[in-house]
Amino acid sequence: NNVKIKSVKLADSVKEIGNQSFYNCTALRDINLENVSQIRWESFLGCVHLKEITLSSGIRYLGRRSFSGCKRLNCVKFEKSTMLKGIEAGVFQNCESIEKISLPKGLTEIGNKAFYKCTSLKDIELPEGIQVIGNEAFYQTAIQGIKLPSTLVEIGNSAFLKCRSLEFIQIPASVKKIGRWSFHGCGQLKKVEFLGEPEEIGEWIINKSTVIRCKKGSGIDAYCKEKEFQIEYIDEEYT
């Protein structure tokens, strides 16, 4: 809660940032994190003047809500490959200025509300290896298009709810579960294409204005007919 600290230079020996270490340090603009391997929960929550962070290949843990509410944070740099296995719940929640982010190889999970209300986020690259996208992970972001990895197994409830700029999404054959309202409220979403056959599909995953492309006679086909969604069948040559 220190409102005067503007810049912090960490010694190379500092490997961990503890819980709420810089919580609501509203004047903080600059801190070096290149040698840090663990950032605990709410470490930088509410640091509204923090604009840029660089995380090294040695980063192995980002605690829940660690950068939540950093409203001016517009540049998050990851190495292409890190030791990080998951983005915990709410890590970048309400970071309203992030426009683009490329997540590192090695990730298997994006937690609940990880990018919740990152309202400027238009472009995100998801690496192969991700298996789970959590509940409300990309709720009300500005994503226009996103390539889901072929390793993805689960899309959580409301994962892309109210992504009003999203126009098209292709669901990989690997996906087994899609939560309720996952793509609901996406007013510009023209089509959702299913390459496989999920075992579980939640309620009202799309608006009725969206077309679902799927295989004729599939479980998705039956789901769409039950919900009276628009259907377009994938051509035999495509399959």
Model-derived features with residue positions:
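Structural signature of tandem-repeat unit edges
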Residues: 2-16, 26-38, 48-61, 71-86, ...
